[in-house]
């Protein structure tokens, strides 16, 4: 997933001490870099995955965004909106063929919203997500996310446990997002998270298990001026591997820049250069709500292989104009190999199809 706060709405004119398991990885220092970076203009923590209870399956998303407004606190005291927090949550009901979603927005502070800087600790009204070291391995993470949506008719309280080391995207965590020298972000992933917890769906509590993917990214940079949006996948493969691929896209559909990575379980990450990744759109679906046309099938060529991505539900479009200002597509999808066999599952994200992203 790429940084995606598209517009600013009306607001704009007990953790382990660092010394317990601090480590430096390519300029990123953990656990501090699990936390917020208020000096960066834009930042997000993003978790997507699949859930199962019996034979029934769902996809889910929970994302917290932090945006620095550039307004000095001294100008208006503690009431000045120096930091804004946003959150999105979504649930894809495969059996019911329906996406449910909700969103939140608030200025930081006043006991309403916060993003702490020493570790992942995010609160936005009644939604929250936090990280602690795993009780079985202090070098790995355990996350907990709690979300409830009356309008969406769902709630979840989920625990995510890391099974692999942190995956540093790009060059040791410095990820290129365009041809320019400043088109970069700090970016790491935690793929292959095991999930367990409770999903409340249409008033019925269900114990669920699953697999998830977490991204954390922050930057002062924006997408290149010639880009109108992007296409991205984060896939957990059944053999324990993790695949990322993305492209930033011009209005004519050509790529401004592309990248990604692949890591087999227990091995080093292989980052992809812009000439090594090709994302080719296939079958299209038109949204009745926005009239945007999205490719819900993709062919993706990488040094790790050639794959097909198939959306498991066509209508996974989210309207976030009440918070981050964009309409985008974010949905549970399968990953197929060249023989058409399913080899993984994860999320596909597409932006800039309803309207060009302006950041």
Predicted regions and their residues:
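N-terminal export signals
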Residues: 1-20
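Structured soluble/peripheral alpha/beta segments that form catalytic or ligand/cofactor-binding pockets
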Residues: 21-359
């Amino acid at each position: 997933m790429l940084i995606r706060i598209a517009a600013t709405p009306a607001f704009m004119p007990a953790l382990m001490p660092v010394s317990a398991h601090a480590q430096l990885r390519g300029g990123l220092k953990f656990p501090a870099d699990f936390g917020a970076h208020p000096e960066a203009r834009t930042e997000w923590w993003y978790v997507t995955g699949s859930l199962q209870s019996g034979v029934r399956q769902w996809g889910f998303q929970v994302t917290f965004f932090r945006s620095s407004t550039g307004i000095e606190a001294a100008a208006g005291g503690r009431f000045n909106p120096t930091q804004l927090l946003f959150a999105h949550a979504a649930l894809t009901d495969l059996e019911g063929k329906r996406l449910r979603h909700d969103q939140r927005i608030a200025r930081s502070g006043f006991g309403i919203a916060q993003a702490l800087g020493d570790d992942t600790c995010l609160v936005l009204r009644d939604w929250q997500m936090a990280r602690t070291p795993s009780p079985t391995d202090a070098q790995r993470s355990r996350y907990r996310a709690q979300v409830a949506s009356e309008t969406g008719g769902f709630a979840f309280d989920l625990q995510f446990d890391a099974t692999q080391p942190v995956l540093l995207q790009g060059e040791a965590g410095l990820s290129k997002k365009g041809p320019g020298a400043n088109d970069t972000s700090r970016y790491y992933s935690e793929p292959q998270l095991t999930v367990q917890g409770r999903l409340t769906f249409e008033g019925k509590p269900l114990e669920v298990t699953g697999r998830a993917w977490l991204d954390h990214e922050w930057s002062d940079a924006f997408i290149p001026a010639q880009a109108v949006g992007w296409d991205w996948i984060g896939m957990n493969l059944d053999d324990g591997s993790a695949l990322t691929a993305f492209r930033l896209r011009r209005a004519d559909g050509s790529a401004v820049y592309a990248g990604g990575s692949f890591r087999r379980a227990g091995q080093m990450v292989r980052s992809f250069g812009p000439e090594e990744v090709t994302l080719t759109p296939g079958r299209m679906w038109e949204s009745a709500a926005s009239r945007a046309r999205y490719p819900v099938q993709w062919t993706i060529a990488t040094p790790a292989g050639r794959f097909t991505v198939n959306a498991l539900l066509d209508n996974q479009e989210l309207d976030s104009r009440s918070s981050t200002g964009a309409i985008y597509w974010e949905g549970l999808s399968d990953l197929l190999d060249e023989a058409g066999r399913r080899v993984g599952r994860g999320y596909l994200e597409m932006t800039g199809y309803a309207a060009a992203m302006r950041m």
